[in-house]
Regions:
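Short alpha-helical DNA-recognition segment
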Residues: 25-45
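The alpha-helix within a helix-turn-helix
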Residues: 21, 33, 61
């Protein structure tokens, strides 16, 4: 994750948390947070790209049975894909200027 935008990383982290929750069979963030002893409002914020503490991040990793490294590998893939899609949507003249630098 070189030259990453912190807000984009948080948004991708939130999206990843949402996917992991749904993969566990929880359609509702409220039910998931209740079942896993998480603050409902805080969990909603994390899924929506707001800051999360390391303590809570580690708790979520334990809930999903993945390591922080595995979690951030998923987030990094999303960030890389997002960057590539962003480049595809830029006008050709902007891309030529970027290559010239």
């Amino acid at each position: 994750m070189n030259n990453t935008n912190p807000q984009s990383v948080l948004i991708n982290l939130g999206s990843t948390l949402r996917q992991l929750r749904m993969r566990k069979g929880f359609k509702s963030a409220e039910v998931f947070s209740y079942e896993n002893d998480l603050n409902r409002t805080a969990y909603w914020r994390w899924e929506n790209g707001q800051n999360i503490t390391m303590k809570n991040l580690l708790k979520l990793c334990n809930i999903h049975k993945i390591s922080p490294k595995e979690l951030f590998e998923i987030v990094d893939k999303k960030y890389s894909l997002e960057s590539k899609i962003g480049l595809m949507n830029e006008p050709e003249s902007v891309l030529i200027k970027k290559k010239a630098k």
